[in-house]
């Protein structure tokens, strides 16, 4: 009998407390970058019943109305009703932002490679904002080259948000979570969806029967291809039986607590650094995007069915201390060739990544819910496949 395996990933909606915090942090980042592309930003947010705290370090000459940005973001998510215990117009906003540490700024503004060397490449000027390791991943399971469990999980909660915002399901509230378990065959290919879990916040008058039927008919069957569903697929819809109290009234939220949702759903390794609220000099964010860019182009070039890229940096140093590529036995060329090609084709210094992916723009708010990777609804530079030919040529 052939061996089959299960793998599970989850996602959360834009109304989840941690995702509210991520979106506020990235909305603040975008508002600052729109006025000052050279700004250094590390904005953290905490949300709970009736209150938002914004704190962190910012170096900029621009003025941004933090209070207004916070309220507008909360309203866009859908928290406009005081019955939810968290509303855009009544929430208390408490900003506490200070200037970036001069000790950190010293290494970021002038990398180790250029100190005392006036003739150095200008892209060596910016040092990494911190030490750390970052991963990027791609696999040929879906059109967007993402693992199927996280791809489906994102689509389910996005569909819930669409139905809520359009009014098609009028009783939905903003908070929601999804989880998808996929069965893989002996060749590690997805063959069916084993289990779907959806918990969605709702008005008190909505019945469990109504929610169950609507979610199956208008969400699950609209999102998951019928070829993956069978009579053994299990559905758990609001399994606690009631989800009226949600959002920050039900749980506090904090920036950076959904890093697996933001990336590959646990299918690939993660370096531990969060993305939201950080400008691109923070390699936690920019190098993770660069690693995804490399991995996706490798898979799209048919050089591997699956690719994971690790980058690592030292604070204040421009060049990465290591580049590692793992194709899990699916590569058509040696991994050492891919690593050499990646270093040749992709500029992996922080300033090089910023230039390559044009990361000084206010593009981050749109990434802060429903995943930073594999997005097909928005144009993200690290999702482009413009290095395929160069990679093929480099490994000949």
Swiss-Prot record:
GO terms for cellular component: cytoplasm. Pfam families: S-AdoMet_synt_C, S-AdoMet_synt_M, S-AdoMet_synt_N. Keywords: ATP-binding, Cytoplasm, Magnesium, Metal-binding, Nucleotide-binding, One-carbon metabolism, Potassium, Transferase. Its EC number is 2.5.1.6. It comes from the Bacteria. It is found in: Cytoplasm. Binds 2 divalent ions per subunit. Its cofactor is Mg(2+); K(+). Mg(2+) binds at residue 18. L-methionine binds at residues 57, 100, 251, 282. It catalyses: L-methionine + ATP + H2O = S-adenosyl-L-methionine + phosphate + diphosphate. ATP binds at residues 16, 175-177, 242-243, 251, 257-258, 274, 278. GO terms for biological process: one-carbon metabolic process; S-adenosylmethionine biosynthetic process. K(+) binds at residue 44. Coiled coil: none annotated. Homotetramer; dimer of dimers. Belongs to the AdoMet synthase family. Catalyzes the formation of S-adenosylmethionine (AdoMet) from methionine and ATP. The overall synthetic reaction is composed of two sequential steps, AdoMet formation and the subsequent tripolyphosphate hydrolysis which occurs prior to release of AdoMet from the enzyme. This is S-adenosylmethionine synthase. It comes from Streptococcus pneumoniae serotype 4 (strain ATCC BAA-334 / TIGR4). The lineage of its organism: Bacteria, Bacillati, Bacillota, Bacilli, Lactobacillales.
